Every structure is written in structure tokens, then in C-alpha cells.
From Swiss-Prot:
One of its GO terms (cellular component) is nucleus. InterPro entries: TF_GRAS. It comes from Arabidopsis thaliana. Residues 312-337 are annotated as: Leucine repeat II (LRII). Probable transcription factor involved in plant development. This is Scarecrow-like protein 29. The lineage of its organism: Eukaryota, Viridiplantae, Streptophyta, Embryophyta, Tracheophyta.
Amino acid sequence: MLLEETEPPNQTLDHVLSWLEDSVSLSPLPGFDDSYLLHEFDGSQTWEWDQTQDPEHGFIQSYSQDLSAAYVGCEATNLEVVTEAPSIDLDLPPEIQQPNDQSRKRSHDGFLEAQQVKKSARSKRKAIKSSEKSSKDGNKEGRWAEKLLNPCALAITASNSSRVQHYLCVLSELASSSGDANRRLAAFGLRALQHHLSSSSVSSSFWPVFTFASAEVKMFQKTLLKFYEVSPWFALPNNMANSAILQILAQDPKDKKDLHIIDIGVSHGMQWPTLLEALSCRLEGPPPRVRITVISDLTADIPFSVGPPGYNYGSQLLGFARSLKINLQISVLDKLQLIDTSPHENLIVCAQFRLHHLKHSINDERGETLKAVRSLRPKGVVLCENNGECSSSADFAAGFSKKLEYVWKFLDSTSSGFKEENSEERKLMEGEATKVLMNAGDMNEGKEKWYERMREAGFFVEAFEEDAVDGAKSLLRKYDNNWEIRMEDGDTFAGLMWKGEAVSFCSLWK
């Protein structure tokens, strides 16, 4: 698929603005305004878990036969109507000791009662203070959903059917798709555990989840706009990537080569209007031609990667480029190996939140892919990935626990970003994010391991310049103050944090 314009006519932005029912200004780069929603290419896919590859296959096969019958005692609870909070108190105030006979004799003046009131007040203040601290610093004390889901996963691994049934019943009582982050995590986790224990048809009928591939085009468009407005989850990495591209081009301002960007990402075009606008405002002007080659693998069920059928941002992005007098070409490929490069262009690769889906244990597909990228001789590579601990995917319970940590940060942050309790946009983003719980092959890794892979592939890390760092910090001030960016290792590592816990990282390589 190829879209190209060689002689851009004079045209205003009215056609772009009228296409949008809404707009959002993120100012990802100093002086520029990203107000244009882009479309995604056609495509949808399904994923089916292969139970025969799981170490607990024997137990699961026998247990799933009785799963429906086992739920007779639990199925009366509707996930949507649970409103009472779970009776989990991790910071209980100390009990007040009853006075003995001698103390009662001295209590006629109310002294003891006053002391009891003071103790009770102090206990309440202590509990509130502890709760606030837990919420602020990301402490796990208040995260009760994981304390139910993780033991259930361990019970599945141990083939302990009675404990599995116990935890599933408790979770079904507490889970809710419209409650707080704990209740929603309980609901998504419960669904994932059921999926692991039974066929996908049974688990999906238990509680339907909305994803990008099943969304209507207008709803998908509206959701992307809203998410970029309320969360830096992808907005900040996109910002850093665009700044890195400009940084690379600025190192040789007299270079008049074309710019070729390989997009291995999940932005659905949201990233590029700001970059195009920045290119048009350079003193030396934009490159003679800008090529964007999108690697769109519709066969991989990677969270956030595949939009709804009929969603195509190509024509809208071309129209925007024409208005800026930029000669833009967009190509879509399904394999990295099919890329056509030229010595007369500056090749830059943007790999964002897609490579962690590749295998990394027996067959190191991640390392092989990075070596394939190196063989293209790019002028720069921007790598943005989830920054999380890795655990062997062969251990279901350990891998599930790490995925729960990732999903908790997403759900907790969307609770702050989306103020409406039943926001449809939030449900769509969360449904897409929590696909990771159902995907046996989707494993994160820490930035140290990714840095090791990049060096083994022949890349050298490069520091972000001051403008890139300042632009990222300026963008982050638009969001909840629990978000922060940490620059480490001589500004070669930009880490996005939520309540002090690592979410993702962005890095630049040459």
C-alpha cells in the first residue's frame, strides 16, 4: 500500500479540523501544537491460547470440564452491581484496652474516656496518613486485588482445585468493571484466570471486554484523543521520539537527503503531525521528501497495536502534510525484511512498545530483530519500551504476577486521568491494555536487558539534548502530578514513572 503526493497544492487545515469532532492540544514540542487525530490501517485479528503448551495442561484440562458447574455458587454475583468495599483493612487501629476495676474507680472525672477518645483519634489519623502514603508512593499495601489474584495463580500452578475455587468465588464477589482500580484489576484478572482454566469462549462470555479491534471507528478516534489528553503513557514517549529525530537531523543541518522513518509502534499516526509541523518550521526547511514506512503486523495480538477495521489515517496525514508544503509518502508493510532503503536518505527507526512481544528465551527473536535493524544501517534508532521485571513465561504464576503489576499501574493512572467513573474511553483503553493478561507470550523486560541487547546488536547509546529533556518535562506538567520523568545515565535514559514506579523508558541509539 502506497500513498504519495509529489506536488502539494495550497490547502488550509479546514478539511482536517472539520473531520474532527473534538481536538486536543498536547504541545509535545516547544512551540508546536498537536491537534490532529490520525487514522489506523485496516485490520483485525484474533488470538487463541494454546493450552497444550502450558505446564499445568493436565490439571487445566480436567479442571475446566467442571468449571461451569463449580461456579453455581458464585454466578449469582453480577460484576457490575457490586458496590460494597472488600473487608480488607491493612492498617487497623489498635484495640482499646478495657479498664480494670481499679481504673473504673478513678474514671469518675472522665479522664479515661478522654484518653480513649484521643487514642481513637490518633489511630484514625494514623490509618488515614498511612493510606495516603500508600497511594502516593505506589506502596502495595492498598493493592488487595493482587493479594487475591496471585495466590489463585499459584494454586493453579500447584493443581490445588479447592483453593482455586475458593479464590475464584471471592474474586467474583469483589470484582467490578466500573469500580476503583482494585475492583477493575480483580475483574480483568479473574477473566484472565478463567481464560487460562477454560476455553476462550467460556471466559469471554463471562464478561465482555472492549478492545481496539472491536471498536467503532469514531469511538476509537475519540478514545485516542481523550487518552492523549489525560495520560502521558504514550504521549511522552512520542514526544521524546520526535525530539530525537529532530536532534539527529540537526547534527548535519546542511544535509539535504530525504528523511525515511520506519514506524514500529502503536501511535496510530498520533505521533506524526507534531513532527511534520516541526520539520516545516526548521530554518533550513523540511527534507525534500519524508517517507514513513509503517510495520503493521496484523497477525500478532499486541496491546494497542491494531485498530478497528476501516480505520485509515493515511489520507488525513497526507492532507496535513500538503498544508505544510511537505512532500510526504506513506507505505505499509507487514515485515521488516521487506523495507526498501536508499543511500540518498536518512533512515531513522522508531521502535515503540512492540518488540517486547517477541520471544526472548530459547529463540531470541528480540536480539535477532535488533540485528536486522542494524543491518539497515540507520542513522538513528529510538527505542521505547515497557520498563518492567521479566520472568520466565514457562512459570504461569510468576509471569502472571509481573503482568498484574504492569496492569495495576495502567488502571491506577487511568483512574486519575479519567474523572468519569463509567467513561467509555477509559473502558476501551483498559480493555486493550489488559490483553496482556490473556497473552502467554507477552513479557516485559527491564531497561538494562534492552540496553544489553542493543549493544550486542552493534548500537551505541546517545544522550538526549537539553531541548528534548526540557520539552518532555514541559509536556509532563499538563498531567497528574504523580507522573514524573527521570533522566539517568548521563541523559541517555528517559524513564516515565507513576507514583515512583517505573512505567516505560525511551532511549536513542546510533
